[in-house]
Amino acid sequence: MLSGSPGQTPPAPFPSPPPPAPAQPPPPFPQFHVKSGLQIRKNAITDDYKVTSQVLGLGINGKVLRIFDKRTQQKFALKMLQDCPKARREVELHWRASQCPHIVHIVDVYENLYAGRKCLLIVMECLDGGELFSRIQDRGDQAFTEREASEIMKSIGEAIQYLHSINIAHRDVKPENLLYTSKRPNAILKLTDFGFAKETTSHNSLTTPCYTPYYVAPEVLGPEKYDKSCDMWSLGVIMYILLCGYPPFYSNHGLAISPGMKTRIRMGQYEFPNPEWSEVSEEVKMLIRNLLKTEPTQRMTITEFMNHPWIMQSTKVPQTPLHTSRVLKEDKERWEDVKEEMTSALATMRVDYEQIKIKKIEDASNPLLLKRRKKARAVEDAALAH
């Protein structure tokens, strides 16, 4: 049973954020307004919504149920998270980003007791259009074209561009987190599930007195670039699948992520085989190569991606029929494995990038710092001797 937190009086009605604006082509260096003032309602969610047992999906941190606004009968999606700092962070980052037209919109947030535990309940718009690749699989005989692939990548790119501009890395951009608002032809594609989202900070390591990076020179890289590059790698994989129907990396042994597949990802071993790639331009293949570079710091940034002619001028991209829908249909029974492989690859990448942190100055082996430390100790010893 859901109930409001004991001893709490309901606040003034939760201010619903304005509905997302229609998608607009982003300028080269967009300036985004960040939503602020997340207010969490303490009254029981059942005061305002009818909660059903229909499960719409499973997020990384909780299940998603269908609910209805009691006043308007409008349907929404409800995500339930056990209250903890990680859940609060997910809600906060998602709230900040939900103004973007290509990110699922948060309507309300509640703090309620459920089975004696404090939970956060996130009311979101209901995305009824299904997953990106399911929609392409279900097209029937209608050809899927290169121009459509370009338009889809532009939509996903706009979501990532918005996030990166407000210093958020999603870190879990994958097929099942890309959903359409409805089954209609003009439905909007949206990014969901902020369970792995991370705030990135753009500090200059050179001016930080107490730390020094040990993985690379401080002027080259701050850790935030690794988190954002994870999203760029995902864009490369999704773009590759859109253009041919199968992933660039795969497991030979039916495992979620085999050692061989891990090696291929790290070594960047993939091909553009015919017939699926015979009609795709070299320019597009080069765009994928720049997204799937093995060295994260060399990957294309989201600004570079959005400024690429294939993305920026999607209306001029040729309507070349692709093999994608046929291949996706033929390999339908293997699609769950493909999704699992990408989930595992992203998990591996997040773990790898977490290792690339900043080392405390006491543990660093910078020769200049060692010399200064030795000199400081000598001065201290001399002072003690007197």
Curated annotation (Swiss-Prot):
ATP binds at residues 56-64, 79. A motif (Nuclear export signal (NES)) lies at residues 331-354, 342-351. GO terms for cellular component: centrosome; ciliary basal body; cytoplasm; cytosol; nucleoplasm; nucleus. The active site is at residue 172. A motif (Bipartite nuclear localization signal 2) lies at residues 371-375. Disulfide bonds: none annotated. Disruption phenotype: No visible phenotype. Mice are fertile and do not exhibit behavioral phenotype. Mice show decreased production of inflammatory cytokines such as TNF and IL6 upon LPS-stimulation. Impaired cytokine production make mice less sensitive to LPS-induced endotoxic shock, but more susceptible to bacterial infection. Moreover, the amount of MAP kinase p38 is significantly reduced in cells and tissues. Mice lacking both Mapkapk2 and Mapkapk3 show further reduction of TNF production. Changing residue 208 to E: Mimicks phosphorylation state and constitutive protein kinase activity. Its main location: cytoplasm. This is MAP kinase-activated protein kinase 2.
